[in-house]
Amino acid sequence: MKHSLNTATSSSSVLKRTILYLVLISLAALVYCDDDYYDLLGVSKAATNREIRQAFKKLALKLHPDKNKDPDAHNKFLKINRAYEVLKDEDLRKKYDKYGEKGLDEQNQGGGYQSWSYYRYDFGIYDDDLEIITLDRGEFDGAVNSGELWFINFYSPGCSHCHDLAPTWRQFAKEMDGLLRIGAVNCGDNRMLCRSQGINSYPNLYIFKSGMNPVKYYGERSKERLVNFAMPYISSTVTELWAGNFRSSIEDAFSSGVGWLITFCSDTGDCLNSQTRSKLAGLLEGLVKVGWMDCATQGDLCDNLEITSSATVYFPPGSTLTDKENGDVLFLNSLDAREIYKEVLNHLPDLETISPESLQGKLSHHRWLLFFTFGTDEQSSLPEFKKLTVHLRSEHVQVGKFDCYSSPSICSELYIHKPCVAAFKGKGISAYEIHHGKVQLYDLVSFAKESVNSHVITLGPTNFPGKDRDTWLVDFFAPWCPPCRALLPELRIASKRLFGQIKFGTLDCTIHEGLCNMHNIRAYPTTVVFNHSNIHEYAGHNNAEEILEFIEDLRNPSVVTLTPETFQSLVRNRRGDEMWMVDFYAPWCGPCQALMPEWKRMARHINGLISVGSIDCQKYSLFCTQERVNGYPEIRLYPANINPQHTYYRYTGWHRDSQSLRNWALMYLPKASFDLTPESFHEHVINGKDNWVLDFYAPWCGPCQNFNPEFEILARAVKGKIKAGKVNCQAYEHLCNSASIRSYPTVRLYPYNGSKKKDYFGEQIDSRDAKEIAQIITKRIEAIKRVKEAYNKDEL
C-alpha cells in the first residue's frame, strides 16, 4: 500500500513537472512569437536607410508573390513589407527599437505592397550610386542648410521620364563629384517633403545654395547641359596671368602658403580648356590658385620660364618657377580634371600632427577638429581630408592629427580606444564631442561646424552630472544606433537655443556601460533631464523643436497629474462650463509611453479651452478599476454643461497623434462661430456694422473638416472684436459663386470701414493657422481704425 502511494505521488510529481515544462515552453513561444524586423530583412540594428532599402529590394525580388509559388507567399511578404515600412521611418524605427511591435499598435503600416516589376525596375533607383545621396525627410533639411552646394533630383518611381534621366544623372554625378553634392529625393516615399518644396511634376531638378532661393533647371536633360547649368554656381576663380600681374599674383599666394597650378597654352602641345580650368579651380578652391597663360601673347614671359610647348605645372609655395628640376615642382601630363586634382592633392602637405606637449595649450585657445589615430592610419591620411582646412576656415577651426601611441594616458582619459574624429570647442581638453557618422569629407565638415558652435559635450564618469549640479540634458546612446545618430544634430540645435539655461551632454553606453546600467537605460537613444534630484525622461520625436517643447513643459506643465482625490475635485466636480480630457495610463505600457509626448503637445494646443490631465493606473489601480478602465491608454473627455457630471466620451480613433486628439476634443466645445444663410450673410455681413471673418466650406471637403476646429479656435480668439461665420457652399452654391469662391476652405475678412455696404468679395486670407489668421485680421482692423481716426481729425 505504501509502495503504491509513493508510486502515485511520484507519477503526480512527474505530471506536474511536465505540465510546468509545457507551460514554460508556451510562454516562451508567446514571448518570442513576434518576428524581429531587423532579422526579417537580414540587416543589423546599425543599418543605414540605404542598406535597409537594398536589403528589402533583394528580398522583394526573391519572395514577391508574383514570382514565389509558396501558398503562404502573400503573408510572408506582408511581414517583410511591414518591417521595411517601420525601419525606413525614423520615428517608427525609434518606437520599435524602444517598445517593440506593441509601440506601433496604433500605426496602420504594411497593409499592402507593389508589384514585382515595381521593385525590380522602380524601387531605389539610385541606391547603388555612391556619388548620388538619396535624401529622406530627416536628411533633406540638414543637407540643404549645410552651406554646401547641392543639385537635387526630385523624382517619382513610376515616372518614365525619371527613369530616362537616371543614366544621365549618374554620368553627371560622376563628372561633378567633388564640385557639388548630387542628391535624389523619392517623392513616392516623401510626399510631404516634395509638397513642401512645391514639387508637383517629375523629374524636377533644383540647385540649392546657402543664401539664395532654390533655382530650377528647365533645359535639355543631357550631361553637357546639366554641367553648363551647374558650373556658374560653383565658387571658382581662374586667373589669366600676364606680364602685368604675374609676379604680384605669385608672390601674394606664396606668402599665404598657397601654391599655383598653371596651364601654359602654346602653339604646340595641349593645354587645359576653359571648363577643365574652372572645374579644377572649384575642386582646389582655397588650397591652390589656378591660372593660365597664353604664350602666343606672353612670349617673352614664357621664354623666361623656359616654356617651349603647352604644359600644366603645379608650383608649391616657395618654389622657384625657373628651377623646374626642383622635385617640389609637379608636371602634369593629364588633361582630365579629376586626375590632375588627385595628383595635386597628393602633392600637398599632410595635416599637422599634434604633440602631447602642445595638445593642452592648442585646445585651450583654438577650435580643433582632430583625427585620433593609433600608429599608421590610412583613413586620416586620405588626400581629400586636406580640404577640411579650407571648408572650416570660416568657422576658425584648425585641423590636425594626434597619435594615441605618443601618449596613451591622454586618449585613455578621453575614453578614446580606437581611431575616431573629435571636435574641440576651444575651451580645453574636456570640452569636446566625438563624431559618430560617416568619416567622409562633407560629413566631417557638417559635424565640425555644428559641434563647435553648439554646447553639447561628451560625458564620462568624471564629468557626469551629479545631484548638486546644474540642470543637464543627457543623451544615453550607442554609436551603432541610427536613431541615436539622427538625434545628435537636433541636440546641438536645442543646446544653442537653451544656452545658459540647461547644459547638454552625451554618454556612449558602449563605453560607459556601468553608468548606463546605474540609470536603468534599456533602449537607445534615451534622453533624460537631470534637474537636481528630479529625473525626467524624454519620449518625443528626434527633433529640436519637440525637445524644446519638452523642456518648456517641465517648466510650465501643460498636463495636470491627477490623483483619485484631485480627479474628484477637478474633474468630477468641475464647473458647468469646464471640460476635461484625461489619459488613464500605466508606466510599463509601450503605447502609453508613445502617447505621452503627443498628449502634452495636444494639451499645449488646447490650453485655455480644455483642461488636460493624466492618472497613473499602476499607482491607483483600485481607482481605475472602479472607473472601469479596462485597457491602456484609455482617453476620456468629460464635457461641459452635461448632467450627470460623470458622463464622458471615450476616444476610439486609430491615430493618437496630437493633431488627431486635438481635433476630436474640439468637436465637443460649444460652437463659437455662426452658421450663415444668404439672408443673414446680406443682413449682418454685407449691410451690418461689425467686422466679420468667414469660412466658406463644403461638407464633403476633407481639408474643410480638418480646418473646422482651427476656425473655432479663431472664433474664440477674436470674440468680442470680430465675429466669425461659416458658409456652407454646398447648400448655398449661388452665394459662394457670387463671392467668387473657387476652392475650399476659403477664409475671407469683411471689415467695417464706415461705409453703408461692404465689398461682396471681402479680403482673402491665405492661411489655415488660427493664430496667424488672428494676427493678420487684428492688424488689418487696427489699420482701418487708424485711417478712420485720422480722417475724423481732418474733418474737425
From Swiss-Prot:
Region Trxb 1, annotated ranges: 236-351
EC numbers, comma separated: 1.8.4.-
Disulfide bonds: 159-162, 481-484, 589-592, 701-704
GO-annotated molecular function: misfolded protein binding; oxidoreductase activity, acting on a sulfur group of donors, disulfide as acceptor; protein-disulfide reductase activity
Keyword Signal attributed: yes
Keyword ATP-binding: no
A Pfam family that the UniProt record links to this protein: DnaJ
Annotated signal peptide: 1-33
Region (Trxb 2) residue spans: 349-464
Biological role stated in the UniProt entry: Endoplasmic reticulum disulfide reductase involved both in the correct folding of proteins and degradation of misfolded proteins. Required for efficient folding of proteins in the endoplasmic reticulum by catalyzing the removal of non-native disulfide bonds formed during the folding of proteins. Also involved in endoplasmic reticulum-associated degradation (ERAD) by reducing incorrect disulfide bonds in misfolded glycoproteins.
Domain commentary: Thioredoxin domains 3 and 4 are the primary reductase domains. The thioredoxin-like regions Trxb 1 and 2 lack a redox-active CXXC motif.
Protein name: DnaJ homolog subfamily C member 10
Source lineage: Eukaryota, Metazoa, Chordata, Craniata, Vertebrata
The encoding gene: dnajc10
